Amino acid sequence: FFKQKTAYEISTRDWSSDVCSSDLIQSNLASTIAMAFDECPSSVADRDYVQKSVDRTTRWLARCKAEMARLNSLPDTINKEQLLFGINQGAVYEDIRIEHAKAISEMDLDGYAVGGLAVGETHEEMYRILDAVVPYLPQNKPTYLMGVGTPANILEGVERGIDFFDCVYPSRNGRHGHVYTNHGKMNLFNAKYELDTRPIEEGCQCPACQHYSRAYIRHLLKAKEMLGMRLCVLHNLYFYNHMMEEIRDALDAGNFAEYKKMRLEGFEEGKINSKR
């Protein structure tokens, strides 16, 4: 895109990437996991378009699998053990999602992702789709929920069989002074933290909480000092990683339901207290 006064002129150059070039780029990056080429239709797209989109994604996946096998066989490939994950799509149409899950499950991939969620639909719609789709994905392969989400979203996803997640929330929200705690999300830009000498979270072992107060981090944010954003991001990443450790421990101990209930009650209590 090229900016011209107050309008934007769209370049006529073809910026799209085909299946093989996508695989080659990921192979050269030598990532542990490569994601198959897919199309993510809008959550409000009409049914006919979504069906055509999903059919196209299925064809692309077959090509991706063949190309990844070829790349992994080459002598100069960096990571010959690179894994390939297929991506389930279908917007908010349960039946299309389920049929697509069945189709890609037959391809015997290394893992499976659920994509196209957290793109405008409600949390309830997202959970409805997960309830419908996850049972049709191989139970002996890892399942990845793409682009999700809040701590509560993660707890709901794990309960429905999701194994891992990725999301910009910890870093993006941290850059805006929003930090996650056991009692919900805090906005350190709020004036009530101006003289608050407590750490972001009592008992937290992250560098931000060990060495800095809410008031000082707020001062850094207000002064547009990069350190303020960095400290918020550090805390959020620590919070998310620590929560995932606790989730794994709860699953191993067989008490995830109790852990989830405790966590959600803490988040809800924080919402109530923040309004007082």
Where do the protein language model's features map onto the residues?
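Predominant activation on well-ordered alpha-helical scaffold segments within soluble catalytic domains
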Residues: T58, A62, Y127, D131-V134, ...
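Generic recognition of stable, solvent-exposed alpha-helical segments in well-folded globular domains
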Residues: K52, R56-R59, R128, A152, ...
